[in-house]
């Protein structure tokens, strides 16, 4: 499994934004990352200043890199329906909120909680609890 470092993740987002603004072609995951960045105009200024934000620690505030990385993970899960049933659960969220970004953020809450619990418990993520969370938010 590919596990990029904090620096690699940040450089990917900075590079994606730089290429987009320069009109350069994007490759691979950069295309998906750009879609996420475009959903978050509040991050554009930060992404345009890598020298200022590259090494910043986010302790008491929302970490934009973590947020966008969770978006990437969720988009990948949806594209392959893994865990099985996530795509159907997301469609229910989409129907409920009638807004793609709002539905994604509802799902991100469940993903973040699942990751947090797995790290806390030093265990694998609980797919059943993850899907249950999505279903609860969709109802």
Report the location of each language-model feature.
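Amphipathic, non-membrane alpha-helical segments in soluble helical-bundle scaffolds
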Residues: 3, 60, 64, 100-101
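Residue-level recognition of alpha-helical structural elements
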Residues: 86, 100, 123-127
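N-terminal leader/targeting peptides and immediately adjacent processing regions
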Residues: 1-39, 44
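Aromatic-anchored, charged helix-turn/loop surface patch used as a conserved interaction hotspot
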Residues: 29-94
């Amino acid at each position: 499994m590919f596990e990029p470092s904090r620096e690699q993740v940040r450089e990917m987002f900075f590079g994606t934004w730089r290429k987009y603004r320069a009109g350069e072609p994007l490759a691979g995951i950069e295309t998906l990352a750009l879609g996420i960045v475009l959903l978050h105009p509040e991050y554009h200024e930060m992404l345009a200043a890598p020298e200022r934000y590259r090494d910043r620690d986010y302790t008491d505030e929302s970490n934009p890199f973590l947020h966008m990385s969770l978006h990437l993970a969720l988009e990948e899960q949806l594209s392959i329906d893994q865990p099985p049933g996530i795509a159907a659960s997301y469609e229910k969220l989409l129907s409920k909120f009638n807004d793609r970004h709002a539905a994604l953020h509802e799902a991100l809450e469940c993903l973040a909680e699942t990751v947090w619990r797995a790290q806390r418990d030093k265990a694998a993520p609980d797919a059943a609890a993850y899907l249950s969370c999505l279903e609860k938010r969709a109802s």
